[in-house]
């Protein structure tokens, strides 16, 4: 698997996980707040972990405390919530772009993770200024003298991998700033030597370094800076004495005062295997050298890509000379892909193509809006305007008015190889530099009402993500075709779908005589018949596509049949509860596609129409329209049945699954991309009935009328 998201989370090695499993099978631990032998042993393991952490950063317990946290964000919030700012004298009207002098200030770089930026709202009622600055404000300009002030410094950009000079730590401290280092990205591939650099606070997460365990981080606090943060509340395990009837309480020693509740002691014990893994790799310096080498090679590969007209395929968001020096650049490349005409491919489109090739990377702004704004030329006004147009963090809106709303990020770790770069290059060559085709011209949208299409095929999918054999006639319900997406396969309580489990395409399901569910393997060698009237066991609520739906379990016999058919263990077939108003449909009750549009794709890639229909998994297929004209419809009627168009259907790598083999073939999605060009790879329209009445049916041969009003 070409994995290029080590900045998101690096991967644990097989040996590391095997060692953890062996340790867990033999190690019995208990709550370290207790005093019996197992609890005492656990406490010793926790304290040994603190010492090992300090050793890793080349310091000792004489110089730093180790507060164990949940993650980097948790550590940063501990500092911000408890930092002893001075007296607040005035309100903050805006975020400053320069550092302010005086008392009680917060500063951070524009290139900061949202976990840093969000601290401004933690301290807003305590400080006199909040400043968001660039590195030059620290290294090249005079820093104003301050007291009782905190600067949260990014060690390495999680957006583009730029390493910020740790000289800033000393320069800020000389002027009275306490410095909290956000080291989350930096420590994943670089050594932080605390005998050379001495921030007041350092926050990081261990999964960034080891890949496993998750949910464990640390806040290192310089002992001569411990007086800068003061705990004013308490929780379980943090007090020496407390009285519930008065405000009296006395906190424990420094580290334990900030470690609220019971520590994740099993996770802490597993840190040992993470440190051993780093040593097996030759130490963090060897990892830095490996990842720097791979990152440089990836950069050179990306820069070499040209369209036939000579224009670059890749726009890179870093200065190339930084990649020559591992002290200035971490193992991250942020970029976007460009069209031959100079426009941009949306990063969602790129991500879908990567999924076909099995490449895993990150897209978006990576929780770093400041860097995103700088490198993509986005303004504060554009952010708010984009929000009004529906843009949200983590969604698929990747271009607005032709401008990218985010980028593509690749990043390397200790398990990375040249193969990862080769796979990315093959994907770019196949999908974005070769086989460029002109988008097909579409008919005048106003002509749609002059056509007289009819329904030619109908499909219902009783089991979500499983195939259908189709029928000529279906009864309608308030939630779509009767029995459509009424069943769902889960494995160890995880929902199976085609995107993650393409073997589901080897099954088909249909309702026979309205009273039996027939499940067959694709070759029809095995089948299972389930009476629809079967009394089922309540299985509780199930979260499907953001909806919580009450379900019932179809029993052990069905589960065992699915285990055999899918070569899995612990499969279960769930059915929507009888009184549920929802089924397992993702977006809309019906998906309608145009047979002529299917035919155009069929001719283009030499794939049979029937196979394309199978891959597109529509409910309704109409005949008698020019290709792609259905995009212009707002409403339609199928004889006396009225429907409204909800949205276009944006396609993903699911249509690339070969129903005969379960393997992924990118040709169909590539053809769709070329035909649609800048239409977001949509195909088909989602529709919803607006005049439903009990007893209605939809059948093949019915006439269809479209409206663009």
UniProtKB/Swiss-Prot annotation:
Keywords, alphabetical: Molybdenum cofactor biosynthesis, Pyridoxal phosphate, Transferase
GO molecular function: lyase activity; molybdenum cofactor sulfurtransferase activity; molybdenum ion binding; pyridoxal phosphate binding
MOSC domain segment(s): 563-707
PROSITE patterns: MOSC
Keyword Transport annotated: no
EC number: 2.8.1.9
Pathway noted in the entry: Cofactor biosynthesis; molybdopterin biosynthesis
GO biological process: Mo-molybdopterin cofactor biosynthetic process; molybdopterin cofactor metabolic process
Reaction(s) the record says it catalyses: Mo-molybdopterin + L-cysteine + AH2 = thio-Mo-molybdopterin + L-alanine + A + H2O
Enzyme class at the top of the EC tree: transferase
Active-site positions on this chain: 367
Cofactor(s) this protein cannot do without: pyridoxal 5'-phosphate
Keyword Transferase: yes
Pfam entry (one): MOSC
InterPro entries assigned to the protein according to its UniProt record, in alphabetical order: Aminotrans_V_dom, MoCF_Sase_C, MoCo_sulfurase, MOCOS_middle, PyrdxlP-dep_Trfase, PyrdxlP-dep_Trfase_major, PyrdxlP-dep_Trfase_small, Pyrv_Knase-like_insert_dom_sf
N6-(pyridoxal phosphate)lysine modified-residue sites: 208
Record's function text: Sulfurates the molybdenum cofactor. Sulfation of molybdenum is essential for xanthine dehydrogenase (XDH) and aldehyde oxidase (ADO) enzymes in which molybdenum cofactor is liganded by 1 oxygen and 1 sulfur atom in active form.
Family: Belongs to the class-V pyridoxal-phosphate-dependent aminotransferase family. MOCOS subfamily.
Descriptive protein name: Molybdenum cofactor sulfurase
